[in-house]
Amino acid sequence: MPSPLSLCRYLPRELSPSVDSRSCSIPLVAPRKAGKLFLGTTPPRAPGLPRRLAWFSIDWEQVCLMHRLGSGGFGSVYKATYHGVPVAIKQVNKCTKDLRASQRSFWAELNIARLRHDNIVRVVAASTRTPEDSNSLGTIIMEFGGNVTLHQVIYGATRSPEPLSCREQLSLGKCLKYSLDVVNGLLFLHSQSILHLDLKPANILISEQDVCKISDFGCSQKLQDLRCRQASPHHIGGTYTHQAPEILKGEIATPKADIYSFGITLWQMTTREVPYSGEPQYVQYAVVAYNLRPSLAGAVFTASLTGKTLQNIIQSCWEARALQRPGAELLQRDLKAFRGALG
C-alpha cells in the first residue's frame, strides 16, 4: 500500500496576502505495517477555499506515493495519486550542496502555479512547511504529464512497457507535431512574461495522448524580476548545451533565449544526436567566441528541400544575436506552414 506524504497544508502568508496567517497544522503520523496513517484533523479552512486559491491547500490524507520517477541535485520526483488521480510530486531537499539554489528552484517552479495550458505541466498544489524530522525544503504536486520524456524517445530509452521504435516515433511529421506542441507552450509562457530557461528534451514530457508538455520550471524567471535585477549580475541556471550565447555571457535573459534552446532541441529531434562533445567550459567558450553550433551538414538537412527548410528554421532559432531570432509567434506560424505544405 502506498504511503501518504507527511507534510502540512498551507503555503506561508508571504506568497499571497489573500491567505490568512494562522499557523500550520502538522498532522500526527503513526507508523503501521502497511505504511503511515494521518491522525491529525483537517484544518477547517481547507474545504472552503475559493477555486482561484485551491492550489494553496492540500488534503494530505489524499496523497499517496507510488514510486520514484527520478532524482537530481535538488531532490526527487515521485509518481503518486491525489484524490485518486495520478500526479507527480517533487520534493526539494534541504541538504543540497547549494541551499540557496535549491530554494530558488522551488520558488521558480511556482512561477506557473496559476497557469493552465495543454502544453504546460500544471501545478496542482504546493507546501513549504514540513515536520521537524523531514528533509524536505518544499513539495510541489503537479499534473502527471506522462512516463516518457522527449529525450527518452529521441535516444531510444523509454520507461514504457512496450516502447515504440525511435524511428517510427520521430518521423518528420512527428517532429513537427512535437515542435508545434513545444512552441505553443513557449508562446503561452512568453505571453505571461515567463521564461523557461532550461528547455531541452529531458524537460519535455509526452503524455499518453501523445501531447508534449513543458515541465521542470526550476530555472524559470519572470521578466519583471529580470528587469529589476538588471543593475546587478545574477545566476541563471540551465543546461550549457542549450543555453544561448547571451546567457553564457551573463547578459539579461529574454524570450529569445528559449527560442535558442528550442533550436537545439529541434536539431536533436531531427538528427537523434548529442549536440556537443568535449569539456563544458570549452564548448561554452566556442559557442560565444566562435559561434559554435551543432552540425547542419548531414544528409537529413542537405538531401531535400524539406531538409533545407528544417535547416533554415533551426539556423534562425540559434542565431548569435537574440534580436535576429524569431519570436514564438512567428516560429509557430512557420512550423504550421511547413507542416501544412507536407500535407
UniProtKB/Swiss-Prot annotation:
Keyword terms, alphabetized: ATP-binding, Cytoplasm, Kinase, Nucleotide-binding, Proto-oncogene, Serine/threonine-protein kinase, Transferase
UniProt domain Protein kinase: residue ranges: 63-339
Single Gene Ontology BP annotation: meiotic spindle organization
Reactions this protein catalyses: L-seryl-[protein] + ATP = O-phospho-L-seryl-[protein] + ADP + H(+); L-threonyl-[protein] + ATP = O-phospho-L-threonyl-[protein] + ADP + H(+)
Membrane recorded as keyword: no
Xref: Pfam families: Pkinase
Subcellular location: Cytoplasm
Enzyme Commission number(s) of this protein: 2.7.11.1
Protein family membership: Belongs to the protein kinase superfamily. Ser/Thr protein kinase family.
Name the UniProt record assigns to this protein: Proto-oncogene serine/threonine-protein kinase mos
Top-level taxonomy: Eukaryota, Metazoa, Chordata, Craniata, Vertebrata
